[in-house]
Amino acid sequence: MDRRRFLVGTAAIVVVPLGSASATPEAMAEAIRKVVGDSAVTESRVTLDLPPLIENGNTVPLVVSVESPMTVADHVKAIHVFNEKNPQPNVFSARLSARNGRAAIGTRIKLGDSQKIVAIAETSDGRFWSASADVIVTLAACLEEST
Amino acid sequence: MRALHFGIGLAIIFAASWAAAQVGADKRRSGTQDMGEALQKMQDDDTANPGMLFVQLGSQSWAKKAGTADKSCADCHGNAGTSMKGVAARYPAIPKGAEAPVDLDGRINLCRTENQKAERLPPESRELLALEAYVAHQSRGLPIAPPADPRLDAFRDQGAAIYRARQGQLNLSCAICHDDNAGRKLAGVTIPEAHPTGYPIYRLEWQTLGSLKRRLRNCLVGIRAEPYASEAPEYVMLELFLMDRAKGMVLEAPGVRP
Amino acid sequence: MANVLVNAPKTAKRGSVVEIKALIMHPMETGFRPGTMGKIIPRNIIERFTATWNGTEIFDMEMSPAIAANPFVSFFAVASESGTVGLRWTGDEGFVVEERVVIAVE
């Protein structure tokens, strides 16, 4: 079999299903506004850890951590994660306190497509901090009958 | 005591370098090696590997009485940690009194119908996958060791023939992807060598655990061939061939795959 | 039967920070996927995961359909005193699962 026929043949397998409902960058901005209100958001202190290339969007490991002493006087109160292309912009919202000792949360998320992910942290002084990541989601090969 | 520790330390170093030398000699790659670091970590950590939820479920089923014989797996087989060790590494095999080989789920269902006098568990059902995962997990870390049963040869040869035959609208064989083009990219995905080292696997695409049969069916659909019926003997023949091709590779069940 | 895997240390030094990891079997059906007959499969997700230490809430997470099937969550806690960490998942269709682990603080 020659290389071209192989590529032509296999490329046809990867048909992208088009989603109907979808969040948008605007919907994400709106969801973020609901959390932060009119406060300024500083792009600092937050680390968003995702694999550089995502092998399957159904289960994407993600860790959000925030630099903070996590004392009663100075700690992270909340961590929120948003996305711009899933059907809904919210991924999760977690509440923390000095009882956590470290402001870091790990979980696994679904990503319908390559897109931007934003994490926002609220500290006990009422300020907001953020980090964002652009992720590339590759499609799995050889799926089953569409269900 | 210190000398003993030193000795053990040396032994570990030698074992590790011996293993590294083996890897150097053996060019075969498990699908694990084609995954990114995040997924490898997910597979290796038992409290992060979602397949372990099924292993836990399987350990509960193992002890549960079933059927009119009112027997559990444990009533006959005792502690799976000893009785099932190495079993997954040598399947498919021909059961006593039978003429055709069965895979691990086939064997579990034979136990259900013949010994427990219970109904068969449906293919890809959670209970069957959980039991399969629990049994396979007992062989984790062991090399794949197909039995030296000459009656298997004909079935294995048929599996090899299926592996090499072109089929489907795309006119591809298993071998074209997984031998000739393994390691290259299919869209963004690295084509693996197709060694059945991790079954049943937690495939992220499925968002659940699944059997080798389900994976083979996905391949067939991928090349637009008609998949064999759900419990067709072709799957067992292919598995016999693939397990022989992966002989000596280490079992990782339950594997995580994209 | 609840099918949960929890990873937390059995013992911890007083004041140290420990990591707690929890994995639970759940489909996290988004409510956006069509089923075999083209009809949308109804949403069935875990909406909330909370953790308590001797009854006091130490962690609370609101989940969305974007959390992957068989949800995994890891977080940290200060080992303040010996006791029980209670984990609770609640969601659609009356889903409630509770799990406890005991941590001895020295």
Located regions from the model:
Chain B
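Short coil/turn and helix-start
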Residues: 67-68, 168, 229
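The canonical Cys-X-X-Cys-His
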Residues: 70-80, 131, 159, 170-181, ...
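Non-catalytic, surface-exposed connector residues within folded enzymatic/regulatory domains
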Residues: 70, 122-125, 171, 232
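An amphipathic alpha-helical core segment
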Residues: 175-209
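Post-cleavage N-terminal segment of exported redox proteins
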Residues: 2-54, 82, 92-157, 183, ...
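Short cysteine/histidine-rich zinc-coordinating motifs and their immediately flanking basic loops
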Residues: 84-91, 186-192
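N-terminal, post-signal-peptide region of Sec/Tat-exported proteins
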Residues: 46-79
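Conserved short C-terminal alpha-helix that flanks the catalytic cleft of nucleotide-sugar-dependent
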Residues: 62, 162-163
